[in-house]
Swiss-Prot record:
Family matches, as Pfam families: Ribosomal_L11 (PF00298), Ribosomal_L11_N (PF03946)
Protein name stated in the entry: Large ribosomal subunit protein uL11
Subunit structure of this chain's protein: Part of the ribosomal stalk of the 50S ribosomal subunit. Interacts with L10 and the large rRNA to form the base of the stalk. L10 forms an elongated spine to which L12 dimers bind in a sequential fashion forming a multimeric L10(L12)X complex.
GO cellular component term of the entry, any: cytosolic large ribosomal subunit
Top-level taxon: Bacteria
Keywords, comma-separated and alphabetical: Methylation, Ribonucleoprotein, Ribosomal protein, RNA-binding, rRNA-binding
Molecular-function GO terms, alphabetical: large ribosomal subunit rRNA binding; structural constituent of ribosome
Function: Forms part of the ribosomal stalk which helps the ribosome interact with GTP-bound translation factors.
Organism of derivation: Verminephrobacter eiseniae (strain EF01-2)
Single Gene Ontology BP annotation: translation
PTM comment: One or more lysine residues are methylated.
Homology family: Belongs to the universal ribosomal protein uL11 family.
């Protein structure tokens, strides 16, 4: 018989830096899950990833206090900022432009994000990412 699911917890956790402090501790503690077990497993699975890169994680909590988790690809905005070496996006995206990104860079990001994106092909994913870049105040070239 399958385990009974009691809930899902969605968090963004820096790669290799999971610890029991907020937001992880309170979120897992509410469901009665073993916080240190999650932290150790998450840090072990994210060893090969750039430390500190925020990774979305979906934790499935079961009735017997066990859990499983799925680590997704980093957010598109984080990958865009990393590609053009930005600290943060523009406060007013329409009037203040903070950088430029090329179609080739967007294609590279799209290939990374493809498994988590709701796009039929790489071209559709590139257009989606271009919209995200524009909303951050980044000029998209070659699109």
């Amino acid at each position: 018989m399958a385990k009974k699911i009691v809930g899902f917890i969605k968090l963004q956790v820096p790669a290799g830096k999971a610890n029991p402090s907020p937001p992880i501790g309170p979120a897992l503690g509410q469901r009665g899950l073993n916080i240190m077990e999650f932290c150790k497993a998450f840090n072990a699975q994210t060893q090969g990833v750039e430390p500190g890169l925020p990774l979305p994680v979906v934790i499935t909590a079961f009735a017997d206090k066990s859990f499983t988790f799925i680590i997704k690809t980093p957010p598109a905005t984080t990958l865009i900022k990393k590609a053009i070496k930005l600290e943060k996006g523009s406060a007013s995206a329409l009037s203040t432009k903070v950088g430029k990104i090329t179609r080739a860079q967007l294609e590279e990001i799209a290939k990374t994000k493809m498994k988590d994106m709701n796009a039929a092909n790489v071209d559709a994913a590139v257009r989606t990412l271009a919209g995200s870049a524009r909303s951050m105040g980044v000029t998209v070239e070659g699109l």
